Amino acid sequence: MTNSDITAAYYGVDPVSKIYLGGELVWPTTPPPVYSAIPLTFKILSAGTIMWRQNGGSTSTTKTIQYKKNDDAWVSITSSPTVSVAPTISVQPGDIVQFKGTNIRYNNGSSQNIFSGTCSFNAYGNILSLIYGDNYLNETELPSGNTSTKNFSGLFKQNMGIIDASNIIMPQNTTWYCYEEMFYYCGNLVKAPTLPAATLVYAAYQQMFDNCKKLNYVKCLATNISATDCTSSWLNQVAATGTFVKHPNMTSWPSGKDGIPRNWTVIDATV
């Protein structure tokens, strides 16, 4: 019998509301979150700001998204290439900020639309809420077509506030440059999202975690990394030691910044 088998408990004829084993609550238990059913979310760890800004380019390539802080209503914001007028969200520790949008890509070649700011946070939830808006629940892949490139390129570029991204749910496929520089120079990032895509296309992960100097955990289930530049410098200048979890059938990872960092422990995933 497991905790989930318990539907009710009694002490004599009196109902029991909680059961402890020592000091640990063993019933009722809270089921783990289903991160795929949650929009992209930041759990705030320190007071500060979240800024939605454009890095380079002109106002013609800005992007509009929506955010919700705690139980407030959804609010639309549009990125700006001018930092002084870029939308800014003030946050405190414990705040929950969620995001959604309907943009196929957040990098137009000449510009990147990025999250920056001064707060520290953990990120989790379904990244596809930024592409499919309210309809992300039934989607598991990036859109196809010629305009579906650079989807999340540079999205967290140089964001020093993001600490743990391991519970961001990523798509099952890749597109050209889809995650190029996505976490570039995120100097305090420790854990990367699980990367489920089997086949990497041209430049898909190029410089994805370049100069994430504290990054020490990566789980990548790719089995085909033959495309040009698909992992070029993707793990350049990360932590000196760490853990790399790979697909058990994948035996062709190179060693170094374009593959598995030297001196990292390699583990086969359970698939």
Annotate the PLM regions.
Residues 37-43, 81-89, 97-99, 109-148, ...:
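Structural signature of tandem-repeat unit edges
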Residues 3, 74-76, 189, 264:
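Tryptophan-centered short beta-strand motifs
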